[in-house]
Amino acid sequence: MDHKAYMYVLECRDGSYYIGYTTDMRRRLAIHNSGKGAKYTRARLPVKLIYAQGFASKEEAMSAEALFKRKKRPQKEEFLSENQDRNLLSYFEESWGVL
């Protein structure tokens, strides 16, 4: 895989979503779950990675993040179910073991 950055969706303990971007998915997920990540996720631990999409540049990942954040919850859920072919979750699960 030749991705330089990722847009990702976390599901928080309370069922809410957190959307972000990163250049190192494994490190970013560990930071979130250690309680040192975003203020939003610190109050809603643990978080679970449910979607990750790779991009050729950080700017593309940031644009995808911004677009996704503007959607209402039903639109986000529709996107997640319709774009499983782009979801890299199974790749990360195979590479890292259980997430």
UniProtKB/Swiss-Prot annotation:
<feature type="domain" description="GIY-YIG">
    <location>
        <begin position="3"/>
        <end position="78"/>
    </location>
</feature>
<comment type="similarity">
    <text>Belongs to the UPF0213 family.</text>
</comment>
<dbReference type="InterPro" id="IPR000305">
    <property type="entry name" value="GIY-YIG_endonuc"/>
</dbReference>
<protein>
    <recommendedName>
        <fullName>UPF0213 protein SPD_1364</fullName>
    </recommendedName>
</protein>
<dbReference type="InterPro" id="IPR035901">
    <property type="entry name" value="GIY-YIG_endonuc_sf"/>
</dbReference>
<dbReference type="InterPro" id="IPR050190">
    <property type="entry name" value="UPF0213_domain"/>
</dbReference>
<dbReference type="Pfam" id="PF01541">
    <property type="entry name" value="GIY-YIG"/>
</dbReference>
